[in-house]
Every structure is written in C-alpha cells, then in structure tokens.
Amino acid sequence: MKYVFYSLLIFFIVACNSKKRSINYEEVNYKVEYKGALKNMMQKGDISAKVDLKEIENLENIYALGALENLKGEIQIFDSKPFNTMVTDSVLTFDNSFNKKATLLVFASINKWKSISIPTAVVSHEQLEKYIEQEAKKNQIDTDKPFPFLMEGSPKSIDWHVINWNTYDTVHSHDKHISSGLNGSIKNKPVKILGFYSSSHHAIFTHHTTNMHMHVKTLDNSLAGHLDEIILGKGMIFKLPDNSPTSYVN
C-alpha cells in the first residue's frame, strides 16, 4: 500500500510540474494572424486584396505590417495607429487611416511589452536573427510559433523600400519589388521597428532565407516602409510580448 501511495504521489508531482511548464506557452493569449502569402505573389502573381484593414480598425493594441493591394504601398500599424506609405508621383506619401486593403497582412494584439537592452556584439542582420530566437526562448516564448517583436534606437544603417508595383508586370522577384518604388538608406536616425519572427512561415510572411519580416518607421514620421537590411547601433532596445500574468489579453 505504501508503494502505491508513493507511486501516486510521484505521478501527481510530475503531472503538476508538466502543467506548470506548459502554462508558460498556453497562457500567452496573443495570436499572430496573417492574410495572404508571399508565395502566391511570387509564383502566381496574385496581388489582389485579401483583407480590408477596417476589419482590424476597432481592435486594441494592434501591431501589423504587410503590403497594400496590388503592391501599391507598405503597411505599418503601431499600437493601432497606421503609418501606411505609398509612392505618388515619385514622392513618398502617408495614409494614416484604415481605408485600405492588403494583399499581405500579419498582425497581433499586444498590450504590454518587455524591454531588453541589445548587446553591442549584436550588429548584423544574421546576428540579430539568432539573438531574437535566443531571447524569445529565455522569456518563455514558444519559438515554434510566430511572435511579434519591436526594436527602438538609432541603427548605424537601414536599407528600406516602399513598393510601387506595375500591375501589368506578372514576373515577380524580391529585387524587382525593391526597385519598383522608392528605396534608400537611413543612417544613425532614431527609429521604431516592428517585426514578426517565425521559422515555419517561409514564403508565407517571411522570405525563404530568413525567419524575420520587419518594417521600420522613423520617430519623426518622415519615413516608413519595408526593412531590407540593418546594421545595429549602440544602445538599441529590443521588445518582446510580456508573458507575465498582467499582460494577458483576451
């Protein structure tokens, strides 16, 4: 009888510990959602609207990025505030409304973030990708599922573009997307960066060579668009969804 009692006790302890370990992931109630897929653009030339931005207009704490329908601009939404950009007569223009449709959209509702200082050793795009995965695991984020992140500070340089696709062109490539509209570099300028990380959404919302999709906005709101390359500067801050109980969203 004694052995039965101890066996049941051990089983109960193991079960409780297993449940506690799973809580770290299961209680994170934010969900990354997406509409559209990069592979449909690149392989099929499908750049039609997949979602109306008005569908997320009334959601709180929305962070979103993507491309406008027909690839006529970039989508950046920070904390439910749109900073969408387009090219009009070779000039960058902003649209701060939800009166647009997207051919690709990735979004999540996050009401609290945890700030982390990025080590000075993290400089390149590749180093950043490894660092993001490492920090996510440290902070009990399930890296088998997509998650959003933010960065703030003054990078040494950022290469960016805002797409302005010729709708009669049915042959797509990443280089053609970059050159179709406006593109350039930002150097040593304070910015805010929104990104989504996933190792399982290649050709869906990340390109096949990376686990990250990032967009950038300058703090003075003079520029926003797709981030192509980055060299980090000193003192930059990285932010992950805060997994503490007070940060849960329904």
What are these regions (language model features)?
Residues 2-9:
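Sec-dependent signal peptide recognition
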Residues 12-15:
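C-terminal motif of bacterial Sec signal peptides marking the signal peptidase cleavage site
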Residues 17-19:
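Bacterial signal peptide processing site
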Residues 46-104:
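N-terminal low-complexity or amphipathic/hydrophobic leaders
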Residues 84-147:
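Contiguous hydrophobic, core-forming segments of folded domains
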Residues 121-126, 131-182:
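Mid-length scaffold segments of soluble, non-membrane domains
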Residues 167-220:
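Short, hydrophobic/π-rich interface segment
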Residues 215-250:
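C-terminal structured interaction module
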